[in-house]
Each structure stands twice: as C-alpha cells, then as structure tokens.
C-alpha cells in the first residue's frame, strides 16, 4: 500500500485580503512518486489562517476513501489547533479557554469532520525554507489567489 502525503499551504495578499490555498497530494512507494494531484482555490476577502485551514480541508475531503495520510503544513495555527486546541474547544462547546468563540469555527468543524474519516498524522515544516513540496503548495496557493486580486469571485479547482 502506498504512503499518502498532503502538503498544504495558504497565502494572502493583505490580511484580510485576497487569498488562496494549495495542496499537493502524493502517493509514494519509498522515494518513488506513484501518483500526484494538485488542488487550489481562493477567495476575494479572507485571511491567511482561513486559507491554511481550507488547504488542509480540501486535501482531506478530496480523498475518495478512508486513508492513512500524513498532512504536512507550515502553519503552526493548523498543526497546533488540530492536534491540541481542538479537544478543549469541542469540550467547551467551541469556546476558547477564555470562554470566547473559536475563530473560524465553521472551518475547524469542517476540518474535524474531514480528518475523522482518515488516519491522519500531522507534521509541521518551516515555510519558505527550501522544502520542495511545501514550496509547490505555496505556488499553488498563490495561483489560487491570483484571480481574486482583481475580481470578487470565489473559486475551487
């Protein structure tokens, strides 16, 4: 059975502002790439954190069947949220420890549902540090953002 990886990234021009998300999905056999798929999309008015979340969500939602997958992100917000904070938020009715509503709650709930179908390992990598797959996810996120720098649409592809 191949090893599955999803490399995800979000980008924003201004925060808030036009933004994009990108995901590179790979099925690997050791060092050999068996299959690769690229996903991207964006929004006219968003935040970097929302784009980071959507990259991970779309990567997991794109899998046709329950899978064992490693999701690699350069977002400490996503990694820390999904592997730690989310358990307290759910226990507290989606409120933070300060009793405030969780920001981007609808995306966190969607990510929680998406990952519940799979056996997910989460890894963090430093962004813009020469990690080729993370750099490709960044390129996809920027490509996903490009149409929204001058229009008011939302896209997924």
From Swiss-Prot:
SUPFAM superfamilies: Ribonuclease H-like. It is an enzyme of class 3 (hydrolase). Belongs to the RNase H family. Monomer. Mg(2+) 1 binds at residues 9, 52, 74. Binds 1 Mg(2+) ion per subunit. May bind a second metal ion at a regulatory site, or after substrate binding. It comes from the Bacteria. This is Ribonuclease H. The keyword Transmembrane does not apply.
């Amino acid at each position: 059975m191949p090893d599955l990886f999803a490399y995800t990234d979000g980008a924003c021009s201004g925060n808030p502002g036009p933004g994009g998300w990108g995901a590179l999905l790979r099925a690997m056999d050791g060092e050999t790439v068996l299959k690769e798929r690229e996903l991207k999309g964006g929004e006219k008015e968003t935040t970097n954190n929302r784009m980071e979340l959507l990259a991970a969500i779309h990567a997991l939602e794109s899998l046709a069947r329950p899978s064992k997958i490693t999701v690699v992100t350069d977002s400490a917000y996503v990694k820390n949220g999904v592997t730690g904070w989310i358990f307290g938020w759910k226990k507290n009715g989606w409120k933070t420890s300060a009793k405030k509503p969780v920001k981007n709650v609808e995306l966190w709930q969607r990510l929680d549902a998406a990952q519940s179908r799979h056996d997910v390992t989460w890894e963090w990598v430093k962004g813009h540090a020469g990690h080729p797959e993370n750099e490709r996810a960044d390129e996809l996120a920027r490509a996903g953002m490009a149409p929204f720098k001058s229009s008011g649409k939302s896209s997924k592809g």
